[in-house]
Amino acid sequence: MALTQRLEFRQSQSLVMSPQLMQAIKLLQLSNLDLMTFVEEELECNPLLERASDDAAGAEAPTEVDQVSGDQLAEAQVRDARDGAMTTYTEWGGGGSGDEDYNLEAFVASETTLSDHLAEQLSVAFTAPAQRMIGQYLIDLVDEAGYLPPDLGQAAERLGATQEDVEHVLAVLQEFDPPGVCARNLRECLAIQLRELDRYDPAMQALVEHLDLLAKRDIASLRKLCGVDDEDIADMIDELRRLSPKPGMKFGSARLQTMVPDVYVRPAPDGGWHVELNSDTLPRVLVNQTYYSKLSKKIGKDVDKSYFNDALQNATWLVRALDQRARTILKVATEIVRQQDGFFTLGVAHLRPLNLKAVAEAIQMHESTVSRVTANKYMATNRGTFELKYFFTASIPSADGGEAHSAEAVRHRIKQLIESEEPSAVLSDDAIVERLRVSGIDIARRTVAKYREAMRIRSSVQRRRDNMWSTMNSRASGGTGLDK
């Protein structure tokens, strides 16, 4: 077989991800507070960029974002999605697996907060949109120590729900980790933790209900109320002291940032809804063309010319990217309001299922764009302030491409599999994934683990160990002959 050499020419098109284009994509994800910080840094380092003001001399208004730059941004996001860098709805805040240059976490450092931890459990505990909305509303009220306000009557009225609906969701929230969270006072916080430990008997209940006597060190009265002796009351008090009075503090003492809405939704005179951007969250910057023109006439060195040309290009791109970001947020928010009109008009019971794809198709944008826009953006409504992503509901895809499965149904199936497992054949999370896949449910192992933990089901290693101890204890009690 002879080897030959030949020259071939191939023509192809590809999108070059320029720094400016990467910047435009990143700006979509930033919260309004992070955006302000970013713009302040740009103002410090770019001499041609300045804040807009009524008497800004020599500054030109930002030019309309042309179709080419808009198409480039959309194409970049499509490519970004193909490369695995887009944030999907099922992994909110988790970031993608693409190049770290496109990862928001590499740009803005963050850590898990109590609110994030509770929100993650909420997504597993409820699949009904109305219950999720109530749950998120309550989570937003939780303070740094893990407590809710004593009176939640306004929550039902604000959301257009019944008091029973709110109480039902609250009862589930109070089963979340950390134990004792979402309590309305110290007594309720301690009672929740004691129930978790299966130690909330009548004597302990009496002790918790009379904490004022404990503060006064009136042990004699406590002993009488609890109906126990000196040794028991001492043990009970010691057990009470081992509980956490502030369960939320385990997540650190990071300062809570004020939630500033990006979008306002107000009733319109025609009976619809008026959606507008919060101008206070939109940095107003301009490119000072006059200053650049003066400098360009005086600059002699090529190095200096290159520096100021780059500064002009970066400033122009930033102004355009900010304008594009504002337009995109408004467009997405308006479509969400249109889709969720029932919620705004009638209340949480009328919150309809919605996904990123439905909004993306309606406004002719890519899902990755909608995903970025809905992260870290808040909407102030007549029913409270909500993050845009809360108006979406998730589902579990089918392994055979058929109809998607609800998260609640999948969670129930996982529980059934574990409850029916043989003590000698405990199912690992990987084994559960395979069982679900056979039944047509496509789910990741980490999702199975998350659902299992939210249901307070121990890991396969822990369940196997529990079975072993149970078997050993059974054999020991049956073979000692001490009952004779």
Curated annotation (Swiss-Prot):
Any single biological process term in GO: DNA-templated transcription initiation
Record InterPro entries: RNA_pol_sigma_54, RNA_pol_sigma_54_core-bd, RNA_pol_sigma_54_DNA-bd, RpoN_core-bd_sf
GO CC term (a single one): protein-DNA complex
GO molecular function, one term: nucleotidyltransferase activity
Descriptive protein name: RNA polymerase sigma-54 factor 1
Gene: rpoN1
Motif RPON box in this chain: 444-452
DNA-binding positions: 355-374
Keywords: DNA-binding, DNA-directed RNA polymerase, Nitrogen fixation, Nucleotidyltransferase, Sigma factor, Transcription, Transcription regulation, Transferase
Lineage: Bacteria, Pseudomonadati, Pseudomonadota, Alphaproteobacteria, Hyphomicrobiales
Positions of the UniProt region annotated as Disordered: 464-484
Family per record: Belongs to the sigma-54 factor family.
Extent of Polar residues compositional bias: 468-477
Pfam families xrefs: Sigma54_AID, Sigma54_CBD, Sigma54_DBD
